[in-house]
């Protein structure tokens, strides 16, 4: 017998391994052979081969042969009656396990088994790969393109790790195993998502009470809103450089919010925000903010030089009096003076000049009472106002009448025979000084106010000689206004 061949050998050529349960054999013998028969049970039962051509005989098993190793016995007989036998060992293998592929546990960086990873070169574990596997191939589909890679079998079993970094995105992997018999098996596809980074889009101090975006608030319980990508599942905040953390809550709108439950101290603070996505990526961002809840109470006073009456009585004879404003903090963003006069109020915005806060009306004020209040707002939105200051503008006074009381002639002729003339001066009630002179103002004598306000009397203390005189009377009111009037009289 020259040769025995397993025609449907499905593995490596001539390895006598097939996945066909009906093996087919070809026997090559000399041309004078006239009978070829085959047996799979050691010669107990024989089947006759069919001559295909001179010296070539064939036989395909008509019924299924069991899985496993077999010994084929071939017997050839020539026309002279010579008989020869030869055997062939062959194996039938029709089974192959279905492989599986899974993301390696340490590289499944999100929730376990969610097939999310932040590793650009993740490792995959291949299981249920039979020992007789001749080829193990991993197909990777990404962005519409499929690429195949050979898996490796090491001490830890079959594994696959990409040779270069994968870009972020979805990857679908499937395993194809071919055994030595040519059986092929495919895994169920596995889709993994590579997500290697996350961002924090914005951090907003919601109760920013100053200029929007200046991160200044007068709230001791600051409220923060954090905007992040939709795959973020944890947002936490810290005010002490990460020593302690609090978890934000996701709102219905998708933003993450947190209102500090305890009072935060006055001053500057650094908020640290950490966002973690479902792949386990982390992003950190900081926000500087300031809590300012205090604002000094301003004061307003009439300038000393314009307080023309008794110091501190807030009466002035200036039509455009000046006012000094104190207690204005350096972080004041708006300073206003509210002036109320005759039931009408006007708000006037002030600016600091040469480091000084001062207010002077732009035009003359008419006589009367004016109530001034200073309102201050700082950059944090705190507000404070002064106690009201009421000033009286009084720019004029008059002398109503001068009477020679001891007029001894015709009433009103201002002639007297008394060398101690007695004068009565009638003035407004706010006059607080009345003085008299008969020497052109060289010397003065102060009149005395009577029990009736506005009536002042003066008796000349020394003898006045006979003759004509000009009495000069000067009245000064509480605002410092002066009025002068003369009276001609005769002592005879």
Report each predicted region and the residues it spans.
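Aromatic/hydrophobic beta-strand junction motif of beta-rich domains
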Residues: 23-29, 122-128, 222-228, 323-327, ...
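Surface-exposed, short loops/turns at beta-strand junctions within beta-sandwich domains
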Residues: 61-69, 162-170, 260-268, 361-369, ...
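Short strand-edge motifs at loop-to-beta-strand transitions and within beta-strands
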Residues: 55-59, 156-160, 254-258, 355-359, ...
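Short, solvent-exposed loop/linker segments at the N-terminal edge
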Residues: 11-21, 109-120, 210-220, 308-319, ...
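Flexible, low-complexity linkers/stalks enriched in Thr/Pro that connect modular domains
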Residues: 2-9, 86-104, 179, 188-208, ...
């Amino acid at each position: 017998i020259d040769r025995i061949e397993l025609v449907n050998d499905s593995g490596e050529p001539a390895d006598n391994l097939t996945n066909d349960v009906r093996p087919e054999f070809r026997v090559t013998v000399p041309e004078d052979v006239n009978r070829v028969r085959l047996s799979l049970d050691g010669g107990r039962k024989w089947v006759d081969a069919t001559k295909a051509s001179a010296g070539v005989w064939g036989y395909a098993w008509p019924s299924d042969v069991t899985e496993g190793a077999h010994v084929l016995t071939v017997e050839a007989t020539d026309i002279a009656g010579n008989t020869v036998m030869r055997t062939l060992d062959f194996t039938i293998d029709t089974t192959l396990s279905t492989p599986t592929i899974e993301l390696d546990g340490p590289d499944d960086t999100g929730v376990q088994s969610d097939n999310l990873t932040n590793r650009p070169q993740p490792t995959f574990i291949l299981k249920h790969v039979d020992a007789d596997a001749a080829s193990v191939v991993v197909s990777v589909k990404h962005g519409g393109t499929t690429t195949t890679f050979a898996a490796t079998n090491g001490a830890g079993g079959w594994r696959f790790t990409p040779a270069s970094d994968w870009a972020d995105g979805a990857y679908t992997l499937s395993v194809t195993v071919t055994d030595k018999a040519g059986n092929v098996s495919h895994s169920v596809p596995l889709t993994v998502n590579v997500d290697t980074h996350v961002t924090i889009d914005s951090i907003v101090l919601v109760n920013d009470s100053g200029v929007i975006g200046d991160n200044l608030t007068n709230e001791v319980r600051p409220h923060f809103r954090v905007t992040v990508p939709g795959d973020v599942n944890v947002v936490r905040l810290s005010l002490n450089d990460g020593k302690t953390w609090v978890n934000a809550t996701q709102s219905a709108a998708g933003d993450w919010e947190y209102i500090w439950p305890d009072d935060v101290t006055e001053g500057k603070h650094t908020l640290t925000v950490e966002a973690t996505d479902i792949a386990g990526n982390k992003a950190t961002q900081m926000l500087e903010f300031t809590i300012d809840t205090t604002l000094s109470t301003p004061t307003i006073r009439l300038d000393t030089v314009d307080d023309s009456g008794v110091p501190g009585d807030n009466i002035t004879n200036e039509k455009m009096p000046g006012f000094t404003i104190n207690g204005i903090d350096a972080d004041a963003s708006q300073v206003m003076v509210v002036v109320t006069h005759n039931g009408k109020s006007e708000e006037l915005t002030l600016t600091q000049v040469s480091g000084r806060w001062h207010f002077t009306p732009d035009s003359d004020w008419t006589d009367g009472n004016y109530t001034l209040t200073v309102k201050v707002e700082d950059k944090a939105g705190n507000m404070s106002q002064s106690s009201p200051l009421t000033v009286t503008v009084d720019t004029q006074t008059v002398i109503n009448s001068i009477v020679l009381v001891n007029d001894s002639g015709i009433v009103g002729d201002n002639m007297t025979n008394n060398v101690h003339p007695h004068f009565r001066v009638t003035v407004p009630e706010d006059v607080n000084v009345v003085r008299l002179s008969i020497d052109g103002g060289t010397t003065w004598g102060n009149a005395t106010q009577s029990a009736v306000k506005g009536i002042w009397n003066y008796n000349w203390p020394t003898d006045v000689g006979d003759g004509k005189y000009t009495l000069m009377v000067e009245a000064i009111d509480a605002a410092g206004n002066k009025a002068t009037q003369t009276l001609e009289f005769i002592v005879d």
